[in-house]
Amino acid sequence: LFRSVLNQPVVPALARQRGPGNVARLAALLETLPSVARLEGTAERRDDAEGICLTSSDHWFVTVGSEGDHFDYRDDQLANASVWDQAPAMRLDELVAQGKTVLEGALAPLVVLEPNEKLVAIRSFQEVRGVRNNSGALLAETIAVNVIEFARTVNDIPVLGHGSYVRLGFSPLGQLVSVDADWSRYKVLPAQRFTVATPQTMAVREGAIRAQFGVPASMVTSRFE
């Protein structure tokens, strides 16, 4: 295990890491992420067979998989903002729109879609944080992070499992708090590969993906055209 403590700048040092082109592509995204752009504190770098990990003294971390197929980022400073200043939970339509804006903007290099692919919003949830007094009694509970998860479809067929999702977390004020993406080479299940897409089969597939991820039938999904 190789360890070193990096001073500024962090990004160029990570970008020089050998390996598939995806690693450099993902590393370039660091410049767009709020806490990395601030370059506050120092970052400890760890290189091993599983990839690269940067952990900052300012409470943010980034990991990039060794094949460049997984990207994980979280800014704990934003996620742990003052509980008393938190806004209400983001509405689903706001969360989907915010996720689309980020994926089509700052994170566009991360999620590269082929012409026959689309992203589908499949579920949302909230990370809830509580405040307790010295006796341990719960004083208040608030939503710290709003999370929206997108899956990939190929020819309108949902691709389940690894290599097919992007999970974004936003503060109640709409700030990007976390990114968890697994975007490796995908495989369409053999049973689905040769199925002709019709309204009926699409309804069945939509039901299957809702069941797989626990998405209520009442939740409206959003497709990126």
Where are these regions (language model features)?
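Helix-loop elements that line ligand-binding/catalytic pockets
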Residues: 168, 175-176
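Preferential activation on post-signal-peptide N-terminal prodomains/segments
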Residues: 2-149, 154-157, 163, 169, ...
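Compositionally biased, intrinsically disordered linkers/stalks adjacent to structured regions
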Residues: 201-225
